[in-house]
Amino acid sequence: MKPILPDYSQSGVLVVGDVMLDRYWYGPTGRISPEAPVPVVKVENNEERPGGAANVAMNIASLGGHAHIVGLTGKDEPAEVLKNTLGALKVKCDFVELDDYPTITKLRVMSRGQQLIRLDFEDKFENTDPELVLSRMEQALPNVRSVILSDYAKGALEHVQSFIQKARAANVPVFIDPKGADFERYRGATLLTPNMAEFELVAGKVKSEDEMIEKGLALIEEFDFEALLVTRSEHGMTLLRKGVEPFHLPTQAKEVYDVTGAGDTVISVLAASVAAGKPLDEACALANAAAGVVVGKLGTSTLSTIELAEAIHGSQDTDYGVISEAALVEAVKRARAKGEKVVMTNGCFDILHAGHVSYMNHAAELGDRLIVAVNTDESVKRLKGPGRPVNPTDRRMAVLAGLGAVDWVVPFSEDTPQRLISEVLPSILVKGGDYKPEEIAGGAEVIAAGGEVKVLNFEDGCSTTEIIKAIKGGRG
């Protein structure tokens, strides 16, 4: 299965769980300490990254999704670092800051690619008032399409059953990265993502794939889950659902450097993909591809839609299909770095017909990459009037993404794509019809940047308006 990337900018995901800050100190080792038989590290640089549930939220943001995070922290400097780092990625931080606890922080000392020691600064959050989190969840739920509960057994999910019930009552699916052998506490969740060790801790040792499937389905029945996604390291992943054939995905990892944060990536891509409208099996395929990318990186890592598209389609088909605006800008930068000429056009494309296909083919011939910017439903309605569009945005974009001439499809909500074109600045801007180049939205900006503006003729006899009239008249 090679799924087309969804438009992650349409996905809103609420992350609730154990928030952490990962710190890294890097430096060479050249001698043993005279004080004790340990290496001396000369620290030359350092790095700070969101970890745990914060890494999950960062993964969603890196895809262009809208992440809202609720978690427990202290009133301290690490909490401020997390808020600033996540805020810069447009993650909405809603932390419960407690006086008597430190923000969970893990410091790793690294030398020559090896971790020498890890220092943990933490106290488990215990006996906290569940309303502190529930009230924040209640405010966030109307604005999200999925919920992730990220459990590292640090206390933020002490009242996890209340959180599950709150989300399910709002008809929002709940995805959980579990911790420990007690799956009873996760009863009623939509899907759990245990790794093989976590699975066997609950179900017992398995000797074959058939036995794993049998035990997994039994867990689904016992704890009222809708599904389990068992991550199996070099054996890939297996999606188990009641009444549906098991769906197995082989691993896509080429090299494994570090599995830190891989589970965070799996659940973030899975939940964001479902929130963006993907069915569960396609969302799992995207999560599997994402895991194959991040295990090839050091430490807690995120990935971009460009990297995810390359993992699915190969480097020659980078970011094929529907893409967010932020990811498109990055994809265009990469295309330019390769010396590729980028062509851009736009329109409503409500009912795709032969004239559109011919137009796309001609536009694609002008360069190496073709972007199609598509008016959202609200924009089409303002431009075309009541009754339009006939097809909603996601379907129009999916059809365009299926054309061989088209590389990227991106939505825009304004009446014209002038702002979007100014951000992208294609090598060639193309419009169909009898426009003059100076009349085309975004044309002045493209020309000022050294690009070209071209007008292409539409094929005679092809018109969306005429097709709609023919359908209403019962002809054709």
Swiss-Prot record:
Q: Name one GO cellular component term.
A: cytosol
Positions annotated as active site in the UniProt record:
D264
Q: Which InterPro entries match?
A: Bifunc_HldE, Carboh/pur_kinase_PfkB_CS, Cyt_trans-like, PfkB_dom, RfaE_dom_I, RfaE_dom_II, Ribokinase-like, Rossmann-like_a/b/a_fold
The protein's UniProt keywords, in alphabetical order, are: ATP-binding, Carbohydrate metabolism, Kinase, Multifunctional enzyme, Nucleotide-binding, Nucleotidyltransferase, Transferase
Q: Which reaction does it catalyse?
A: D-glycero-beta-D-manno-heptose 7-phosphate + ATP = D-glycero-beta-D-manno-heptose 1,7-bisphosphate + ADP + H(+); D-glycero-beta-D-manno-heptose 1-phosphate + ATP + H(+) = ADP-D-glycero-beta-D-manno-heptose + diphosphate
Instruction: Identify the stretch(es) annotated as Ribokinase.
Output: 1-318
One GO-annotated biological process of the protein: ADP-L-glycero-beta-D-manno-heptose biosynthetic process
The enzyme class is: transferase
Q: Where is this region: Cytidylyltransferase?
A: 344-476
Molecular function GO terms recorded:
ATP binding; heptose 7-phosphate kinase activity; heptose-1-phosphate adenylyltransferase activity; phosphotransferase activity, alcohol group as acceptor
**Entry's PROSITE patterns?**
PFKB_KINASES_1
Q: What is its EC number?
A: 2.7.1.167, 2.7.7.70
Q: Specify the pathway.
A: Nucleotide-sugar biosynthesis; ADP-L-glycero-beta-D-manno-heptose biosynthesis; ADP-L-glycero-beta-D-manno-heptose from D-glycero-beta-D-manno-heptose 7-phosphate: step 1/4; Nucleotide-sugar biosynthesis; ADP-L-glycero-beta-D-manno-heptose biosynthesis; ADP-L-glycero-beta-D-manno-heptose from D-glycero-beta-D-manno-heptose 7-phosphate: step 3/4
**Binding site residues for ATP:** N195, M196, A197, E198
Show the Pfam families listed in the entry.
CTP_transf_like, PfkB
Carries keyword Kinase?
yes
Q: Which family does it belong to?
A: In the N-terminal section; belongs to the carbohydrate kinase PfkB family.
Subunit structure, as described in the record: Homodimer.
What is the role of the protein in this entry? Catalyzes the ADP transfer from ATP to D-glycero-beta-D-manno-heptose 1-phosphate, yielding ADP-D-glycero-beta-D-manno-heptose.
Q: What is this protein called?
A: Bifunctional protein HldE
UniProt organism field: Vibrio atlanticus (strain LGP32) (Vibrio splendidus (strain Mel32))
This chain is encoded by the gene named hldE
